[in-house]
C-alpha cells in the first residue's frame, strides 16, 4: 500500500507558512540567525537504505504477489474445502508439538527424522514487548504494534493463559531490517542477557529464504518450561507476509514448534497456503495449554488426553 505521509505533510506545512507570512509582514531573519538553525532531525525510516535492504524489499514484494496470484496466503482460516477429523487433529498436534522444525543446537539445520521430544510451553505469564529498528518508519510501527496487540489478545483468549503486552517483557518481538543489525545485537544482549554468540550469529545472518524466526529459551533445571523468547521479523516484508510472520512466530514461540506437511488448514505447513492463524491452529493452541496436559509429557503419555481434547474441540462425543 502506497503511503504519502511525508509528501502531504510537506505540502501542508508550506500552506501554513504561507498563511502566516500573508497575515503579517515579517522581515526575514539575518543570515547569521538562519545559519544557526539546527538541521532537522531525520525521522525513523527516512534515511538512505542500503542496496541489500532495497533488494530484499523488492524480492519479498514480488514473492507476495506471486503467492497471491497462485491463490496462496489465504486469510479465510479454512472452510468447506479443508475438512479435518478429530483423529487428524490429534496427529497434527503430535507432529507440531512434539517434534522440532530445526535440530536443537544446530542452527538452522533441519531436524529431519528425529524422535519425538517432550511437550514444551510457558508455565508462567507471557509478556510480549516490541522493538523496532531505525529503518522502520513511524507509520509502519503504528500498524505493526496494532497488529501485534490485537493478536496478543487473540492468543490470550484461545489459550486461556496469561499473555499480555508489556513495555519490558519476556517474549521479545523485533521488527528489524538489514540495516539494523548492529542495533539488533545490542537489543538482543540487553533483553536476553544469557543469549549465546552462536544464537546471535544465526539471527543476524538469516538467508533470504528464512522470512522470520523465533527462538525460545528455557532453564537447565526446567528444560520444558519456556521462560523467554525472541521473534525476529524482517522490516523489508510487505504487509501480508509481515503479518503472517507475526502470526506464525508468536504461536510457535508459545510451543507449536514444528511444521507438518499434513497440517491443513494451518500456518504450520511450509506450503504457504494460509497466511494467518486458522481455526485449526486455534484448536492446537487451546489443546497445548489445557491443564490436563503438562510440560515435559512425552507423545505416548499425552496421546490419550490429546485424543479427548481433539474430540472436545470438534464437538464430538467421547
Name these PLM-found stretches.
Residues 2-14, 18-171, 176, 180-189, ...:
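N-terminal low-structure segments adjacent to metalloprotease catalytic domains
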Amino acid at each position: 500500500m502506497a503511503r504519502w505521509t511525508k509528501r502531504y505533510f510537506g505540502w501542508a506545512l508550506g500552506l501554513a507558512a504561507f498563511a502566516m507570512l500573508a497575515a503579517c509582514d515579517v522581515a526575514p531573519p539575518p543570515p547569521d540567525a538562519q545559519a544557526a538553525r539546527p538541521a532537522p532531525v531525520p525521522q525513523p525510516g527516512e534515511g538512505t537504505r542500503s542496496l541489500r535492504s532495497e533488494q530484499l524489499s523488492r524480492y519479498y514484494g514480488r514473492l507476495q504477489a506471486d503467492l497471491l496470484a497462485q491463490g496462496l496466503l489465504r486469510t479465510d482460516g479454512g472452510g468447506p474445502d479443508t475438512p479435518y477429523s478429530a483423529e487428524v487433529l490429534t496427529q497434527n498436534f503430535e507432529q507440531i508439538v512434539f517434534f522440532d522444525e530445526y535440530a536443537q543446537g544446530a542452527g538452522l539445520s533441519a531436524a529431519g527424522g528425529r524422535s519425538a521430544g517432550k511437550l514444551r510451553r510457558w508455565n508462567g505469564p507471557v509478556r510480549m514487548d516490541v522493538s523496532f529498528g531505525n529503518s522502520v518508519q513511524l507509520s509502519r510501527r503504528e500498524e505493526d504494534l496494532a497488529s501485534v496487540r490485537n493478536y496478543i489478545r487473540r492468543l490470550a483468549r484461545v489459550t486461556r493463559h496469561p499473555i499480555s503486552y508489556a513495555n519490558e517483557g519476556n517474549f521479545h518481538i523485533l521488527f528489524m531490517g538489514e540495516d539494523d543489525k548492529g542495533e539488533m545485537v545490542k537489543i538482543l544482549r540487553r533483553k536476553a542477557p544469557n543469549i549465546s554468540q552462536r544464537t546471535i550469529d544465526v539471527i543476524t545472518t538469516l538467508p533470504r529464504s528464512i522470512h522470520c524466526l523465533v527462538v525460545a529459551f528455557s532453564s537447565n533445571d526446567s528444560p520444558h518450561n519456556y521462560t523467554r523468547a525472541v521473534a525476529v521479523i524482517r522490516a523489508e516484508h510487505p504487509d501480508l507476509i509481515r503479518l503472517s510472520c507475526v502470526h506464525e512466530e508468536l504461536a510457535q514461540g508459545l510451543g507449536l514448534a514444528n511444521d507438518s506437511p499434513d497440517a491443513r488448514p494451518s500456518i504450520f505447513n511450509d506450503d504457504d497456503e494460509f497466511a494467518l492463524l486458522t481455526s485449526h491452529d486455534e484448536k492446537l493452541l487451546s489443546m497445548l495449554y489445557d491443564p490436563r496436559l503438562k510440560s515435559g509429557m512425552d507423545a505416548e503419555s499425552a496421546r490419550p488426553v490429546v485424543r479427548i481434547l481433539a474430540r472436545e474441540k470438534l464437538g464430538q462425543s467421547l
